[in-house]
């Protein structure tokens, strides 16, 4: 006999009353963006490897490299946030010290997408 399971996203909603699912995911993603991935973390358990891939060493002038970074970023976000069903990540602007991204995510049980415009500036994602 199978035991019923409760989705992780439901626990988030129960713990934080009065906050919309979009706002909750936005907050969680901002925490993720301001954490760093462990280098060589492929051999560690997923719980220990959460964090954003480093972009400072990325050649922001090469579109192929930026596309690769967006794929890495998308994979990190999907590992971190199970309530996201669909995610599109794109670069809006890239320079030596700044990187602006656009995220569009469809959340479970939500009809409207979550849209985020975030940028790295002065050592922090905002």
Swiss-Prot record:
Gene Ontology cellular component list: cytoplasm
Annotated keywords: Cytoplasm, Stress response
Principal subcellular localisation of the protein: cytoplasm
Location in or out of the cell: Cytoplasm
A molecular function GO annotation: anti-sigma factor antagonist activity
The keyword Cytoplasm is assigned to this record: yes
Coiled-coil blocks: none
Any GO BP annotation: DNA damage response
Subunit structure: Interacts with RssB.
Family: Belongs to the GpW/Gp25 family. IraD subfamily.
Function comment: Inhibits RpoS proteolysis by regulating RssB activity, thereby increasing the stability of the sigma stress factor RpoS during oxidative stress. Its effect on RpoS stability is due to its interaction with RssB, which probably blocks the interaction of RssB with RpoS, and the consequent delivery of the RssB-RpoS complex to the ClpXP protein degradation pathway.
Protein name per UniProt: Anti-adapter protein IraD
Organism: Salmonella typhimurium (strain LT2 / SGSC1412 / ATCC 700720)
């Amino acid at each position: 006999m199978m035991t019923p399971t409760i989705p992780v996203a439901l626990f988030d909603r129960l713990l934080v009353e009065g906050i919309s699912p979009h706002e909750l995911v936005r907050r969680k993603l901002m925490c993720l963006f301001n954490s760093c991935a462990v280098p060589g973390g492929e051999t560690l358990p997923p719980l220990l490897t959460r964090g954003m891939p480093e972009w400072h060493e990325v050649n922001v002038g090469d579109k192929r490299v930026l596309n690769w970074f967006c794929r890495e970023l998308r994979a990190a976000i999907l590992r971190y946030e199970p309530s996201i069903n669909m995610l599109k990540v794109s670069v809006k602007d890239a320079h030596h010290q700044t990187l602006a991204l656009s995220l569009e995510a469809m959340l479970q049980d939500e009809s409207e997408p979550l849209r985020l415009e975030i940028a790295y500036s002065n050592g922090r994602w905002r």
